[in-house]
Regions:
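Conserved small/aromatic sequence motifs within transmembrane helices
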Residues: 1-14, 18, 22-172
Length: 172
């Protein structure tokens, strides 16, 4: 209860600044990339409940989600993948041409995650906690996923602080 109070209080305090950035980024994306400006994806949250995660769209509209899924599953199975042929390959897909120039900047600055504040206000997420996984990711974590899902997922957490997507599956 105290954590939820903290999350909502922080979001409300920073809401004027958040709204300014949301509006500016939204208009810029609308002009540069067109609609849709938001990327909505089902994620696994607390108690393994599914919820819709909101982010700014950073990829071309034609980007296939199965591309990431197959890459991720190959990593999880220990298959050797490009570019270093190491099973400890970070999750990030290097030189991913599906990512727009604007999207690359938003990702680097973590501004693509700004719409996650709506998930905090809806009670699906917290400010700090483990990142919510996509369903096919959560299935691979087994018992560890039960621990992850015992708390609300967060906008930021230990993995983001320690190395973001440059961490391998084993290091996450």
């Amino acid at each position: 209860m105290l954590k939820k109070f903290f999350d909502i209080t922080v979001v409300i305090i920073f809401m004027p600044l958040i709204i300014i950035f949301l509006i500016l980024i939204s208009f810029y994306l609308l002009i540069k990339q067109g609609k849709p400006i938001f990327f909505v994806q089902n994620r696994v949250g607390k108690d393994n409940k599914s919820f819709k995660l909101y982010k700014f769209r950073t990829m071309e509209i034609t980007a296939e989600e199965d591309f990431h899924k197959s890459h991720y599953l190959d990593l999880a199975k220990g298959k050797q993948v490009e570019p270093t042929n190491s099973p400890l390959e970070p999750i990030r897909i290097e030189n991913d041409d599906r990512i727009t120039i604007t999207g690359a900047f938003l990702r680097k600055a973590s501004l693509d995650e700004l719409p996650n504040v709506f998930n905090v206000l809806l009670g699906d997420m917290s400010i700090v906690g483990p990142r919510p996984l996509v369903d096919y990711e959560s299935e691979l974590y087994g018992d560890y996923n039960l621990k992850r899902c015992s708390v609300l997922p967060g906008i930021t957490g230990l993995a983001q602080i320690q190395g973001r997507l440059d961490l391998s599956l084993q290091e996450r």
